[in-house]
Design a protein with these regions (language model features):
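A secondary-structure capping/hinge motif
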Residues: 34, 41-44
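A short, Lys/Arg-rich alpha-helix, primarily the initiator
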Residues: 1-16
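Residue-level detection of the helix-turn-helix DNA-binding "recognition helix"
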Residues: 11, 15, 29, 40-42, ...
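Short, charged recognition helix plus adjacent turn
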Residues: 1, 55, 65-77
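DNA major-groove recognition helix of helix-turn-helix/homeodomain DNA-binding modules
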Residues: 48-63
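Residue-level signal for the short linker/turn that defines the boundary of a DNA-recognition helix
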Residues: 8, 18-19, 45-48
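Short alpha-helical DNA-recognition segment
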Residues: 18-37, 52
Length: 77
């Protein structure tokens, strides 16, 4: 199985949510051009941005980093 990059995971998440770049970037507090740079692999998102994505859209950081196939964030009960 091919490992996906963070840029591919961000784009996959956005398209799964049926969001355009404008709405997704606004939801996480970044510019659309910055999101485009992330998705195209030009710039690597900071840890703060990745944490915001994980929290806002309830996905695991392990999934974003390609360390797990489990997309859903498991909360501590």
């Amino acid at each position: 199985m091919q490992e996906s990059s963070i840029s591919e995971k961000i784009k996959e998440l956005r398209t799964d949510l049926k969001m355009n770049q404008k709405n997704f970037s606004a939801a996480i507090g970044i510019r659309q051009s910055t999101l485009s740079s992330y998705e195209n692999g030009v710039v690597t998102p900071s840890n703060d941005v990745l944490l915001t994505i994980a929290q806002k859209f309830h996905v695991s950081l392990d999934w974003l980093f390609g360390l797990s196939e489990n997309k859903v964030q498991i909360s501590n009960l």
